[in-house]
Amino acid sequence: MQDYSVSGDFGQVKFYNTSLSSGRFKSTGKILCMGWHCVNPLYSISRPNGLDTNLLLLTRRGKGDIAISGKEFNALPGTAIILPRSTPHSYRAAQGCEWEFYWLHYNGGHTQAYTEDILTAAYS
């Protein structure tokens, strides 16, 4: 997939394809792609079956509403949220808000164990 930048009624998105799967990343995992979004409440993503990758969302500005396996979270500036692979989720800009965030899809190697350790520590 090629890099792209798209604007529309929903806001603006940028996508960067990467292949950081060699060298030191090979044994620990792979950053598959990353990007930046600055969106309004028209932007909404719903994945009832989740993804086949882990997804890290980093809020820079505004507010996002995120649902993970039926639990609701607010993504405020400075918030990092991990959406584990194969986990149902949805996210959108909060009503009346613009939401600017960075995202990163990663998978492979030791990333699943790291993700589980981070989530266990966060919720224990």
Label every PLM stretch briefly.
Residues M1-F73, Q95:
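Generic protein-terminus/edge-of-domain signal
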Residues G29, L51, E72, S86-H110:
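Ligand-binding loop in jelly-roll beta-barrel domains
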Residues G70-P84:
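Short acidic-glycine-tyrosine-enriched beta hairpin
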Residues P41, T111-Q112:
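Low-complexity, intrinsically disordered short segments enriched for Gly/Pro and polybasic residues
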Residues Q112-S124:
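Amphipathic alpha-helical segments enriched in hydrophobic/aromatic residues interleaved with Lys/Arg
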